[in-house]
Amino acid sequence: MDSEYAALLERAYKLVAPKAQRRAEIPKIEVENMPRKTIIPNFGQIAKRLNRDVYFMAKFFQKELAVPGTLEGDVFTLHGEKSPKVVEAVYDRFIRYYVVCPVCNSIDTELRKEGRIFIMRCLACGASTPVRPL
C-alpha cells in the first residue's frame, strides 16, 4: 500500500506544473549622484515593469523627497542631491504602498482611480484594496 501510494504521489507531482514564481521580480533602482542632482536612469523601465504610470511614480518621489524633478524619456532627474540609500528607501515605500498586494503579497497588481480613491487590484488573487492618495 505504501509503495503504491508513493508511486501515485510521485506521478501526481510530475503531472502538476511546478509552483509558479512571481511573474516579474521587483526591478532594482539605479541611482547616480551628480553635483546638485540625483539621476535615476532606469525610472521609465521600472514603471513599465511594475505596471504603474511613470508620472504617478515621479509625483510620489518628488513628494517623499521634497525636491522638484524632471522626467525625460526613461530618465528621472531630482533637482537635489540625495543619497542612494534614501532614494532606495523611498522606492521600497512605493513598492509597499502601491505595488504589493496586502492579501497575497503578489506584485501582479494594477492601480486605477475611482472617483477620488485609488484602488489597487491584484491580478493574482482578485483582491481590491484602497490605497492612500498622493
UniProtKB/Swiss-Prot annotation:
* Listed HAMAP family: eIF_2_beta
Q: Which InterPro entries match?
A: IF2/IF5 (IPR045196), TIF2_bsu_arc (IPR004458), Transl_init_fac_IF2/IF5_dom (IPR002735), Transl_init_fac_IF2/IF5_N (IPR016189), Transl_init_fac_IF2/IF5_Zn-bd (IPR016190)
Q: How does it assemble?
A: Heterotrimer composed of an alpha, a beta and a gamma chain.
User: Protein name, please?
Assistant: Translation initiation factor 2 subunit beta
Q: Which organism is it from?
A: Pyrobaculum aerophilum (strain ATCC 51768 / DSM 7523 / JCM 9630 / CIP 104966 / NBRC 100827 / IM2)
In the UniProt record, the gene name given for this protein reads eif2b
PANTHER family named in the record: EUKARYOTIC TRANSLATION INITIATION FACTOR, EUKARYOTIC TRANSLATION INITIATION FACTOR 2 SUBUNIT 2
Give this protein's Gene Ontology molecular function annotations.
translation initiation factor activity
- Role noted for this protein: eIF-2 functions in the early steps of protein synthesis by forming a ternary complex with GTP and initiator tRNA.
Q: Which UniProt keywords apply?
A: Initiation factor, Protein biosynthesis
